[in-house]
């Protein structure tokens, strides 16, 4: 009661925010007459003036009224559109680093131009983030005309662009692109080997369109750049054959749809074990024995593929490939793959070619990528329901912008049926009735399967209609643009983020582009254009009189936002419209999250075949169910972020250090420091503090010096000298290593030596980081089990992640030292050190990275000191044969106390020497 009274007296937080922005609107409007009086050249020259003032110390906030007035006038002249007052408020909200919630059709694209123009005056670049490539290209092309008029440059990032074009696009004042492209460019840049090869510049301001889709719906989706791992195609097929039979027995597994999880029962595990043994997959031991852990993993992923993932709902098979469907937008997600072997399990299930598994080389979530921007803002039609999450995770406040005209849409109460069949029959009947009028209909479904089922029902009734789902995504823009034409009936999977407004009467601009594309005669083109415009205007009046767009939802989504986005397709810019949702007790939301009380009450009402119940109480109950789901999903995203933040802190440190290495001209001191640390570790390990020479492990230390430093030193003789202690041995090792490196540098020449040092550092860094990511991922998967031991999994993860990070840095120092001690340069490089030089090592599976090593830089893996074998490029001494870790015949005579050439880190006598 007190909260209601306070709102009545002081207004809501949103009202107070709006008032603060509204105070500046008259100031902008007052400048309009004098700005309109400027000719085109004088108006464009304002940009130069503004930039000079910013350089002189004027803040962007102080420039806002003038800059907005100039941008509004330029839009009027170039685009034929003038910003409304509410759009000015939207621009201010974006400039303030907040989220502007604007209803569909209120001109979000135009609103963004105000904040984009103002931020671009700083000269530091603005990134405008869209949900798909079509929108990025469209907005860059259309709004680019406005920016060009004002003297600003515009770039657009699309897939498969060469790096030179990407770099040019990022150097532009304004850069359009999808969230995927921006994120992948960030990861690729941090895998480059030269600063000048990077494409992005330091981040400044990102304005995210459909911000809820990107920062909420896709928050837990990591962007991953991966390289090939070992091929397990045969194992996937064998396991799939077993699981295909197993899922016919419901008692063999337990499925939890609410949490999207499935496990084998004891009976199921016994059945799988017997079937795998019969198939020859399980050769020894039980299913859960440690040496069969890979088989368990394949079984679990295959079980998930068969029980939790449905064809035409979660994915489709297209062109012999399994393509993921975005659960929020219904679009195909080409290029994306499920990780951890799940995608391969789906390929085995669908009997298509199984692609090779990948190992993560670099990854980041959208949550952490967008938090890299010093300034972040966004816009969407539906954000208020997730305002708490935006505030808590991104520190972004949501401001609801009032519509320019009152919303005239009529939202009817839901109709609830007992079965899905009755529900779809009722929907078909309603569409059949509306089809007798000019009123257009948009029907929203939750999957391809359901959209095609409804399409069949309408076809049987002889009702003409269009279907928009992932199968027909090429026709998306055309279908959506004409969904408001008289009599149009459109069935669409999730309409979220479609980006094209449904205009009553049809989209005149798109019709002109499509129908007049091949007409070259100017007079004929003008005549036909006038006819189309007149016809669309007539159609607009017809549809308006018929009641506007009728939106039908065939199922409630887990998120209220998706429902609101579907409703919001009707009633844009004050147009009339209607919406109604049809629901059944068999729908996923009702079946999984609905209350037993609701189902019991509907059963007691004794509904007959085809009857529905319509009551506001039902709507409230459904909203409560949706809120429960939203709260659960928020908790899951928040929990994921806590773990991801641990890795994110490490990622930022690694990328910053790597960038320092790339930018440095001379890394000799860094390499020397690493070598010194390794020598200190070696000596401390073999010569205990305050020990006698008889207690030293002199032979082992000599082997370490040979294996790691490439030095054959008389350490046993040193031990017999008077007055020699561990410190003296350390100094002698350091001096010997320094002299060896100095001799190499003199032999190679300074330029080649500096080049090799940088390449060895970068490639080794990439190698240990890749292994570290794998270790973190494996630890993350099992860390939740620590809760059974009364330990906090998050604290355990933080502690062990730090230990792994420390071990990674130790491995980096070791491998760099070992590699630099053995690297040699073949004669062709000595003659011409930079002839055809490319990166020493780069993964050929990472787009945009060089994959050929420099001519003459040969490779030989080296043994490690307490770490895994290096997989980086080092050189075999000239005249020596290469030692191959997997080929014992290439090892020659190996001393029994030396490190094993296989790279295990063990002594030869305890490794392959023992087996020999």
Swiss-Prot record:
GO terms for cellular component: cell envelope Sec protein transport complex; cytosol; plasma membrane. Its EC number is 7.4.2.8. The keyword Translocase applies. SUPFAM superfamilies: Helical scaffold and wing domains of SecA, P-loop containing nucleoside triphosphate hydrolases, Pre-protein crosslinking domain of SecA. Its cofactor is Zn(2+). GO terms for biological process: intracellular protein transmembrane transport; protein import; protein targeting; protein transport by the Sec complex. The keyword Ribosomal protein does not apply. It catalyses: ATP + H2O + cellular proteinSide 1 = ADP + phosphate + cellular proteinSide 2. ATP binds at residues 87, 105-109, 501. Keywords: ATP-binding, Cell inner membrane, Cell membrane, Cytoplasm, Membrane, Metal-binding, Nucleotide-binding, Protein transport, Translocase, Translocation, Transport, Zinc. Zn(2+) binds at residues 900, 902, 911-912. One of its GO terms (molecular function) is protein-exporting ATPase activity. May bind 1 zinc ion per subunit. It is found in: Cell inner membrane; Cytoplasm. It is a peripheral membrane protein. Monomer and homodimer. Part of the essential Sec protein translocation apparatus which comprises SecA, SecYEG and auxiliary proteins SecDF-YajC and YidC. Belongs to the SecA family. Part of the Sec protein translocase complex. Interacts with the SecYEG preprotein conducting channel. Has a central role in coupling the hydrolysis of ATP to the transfer of proteins into and across the cell membrane, serving both as a receptor for the preprotein-SecB complex and as an ATP-driven molecular motor driving the stepwise translocation of polypeptide chains across the membrane. This is Protein translocase subunit SecA. It comes from Gluconacetobacter diazotrophicus (strain ATCC 49037 / DSM 5601 / CCUG 37298 / CIP 103539 / LMG 7603 / PAl5). The gene is secA.
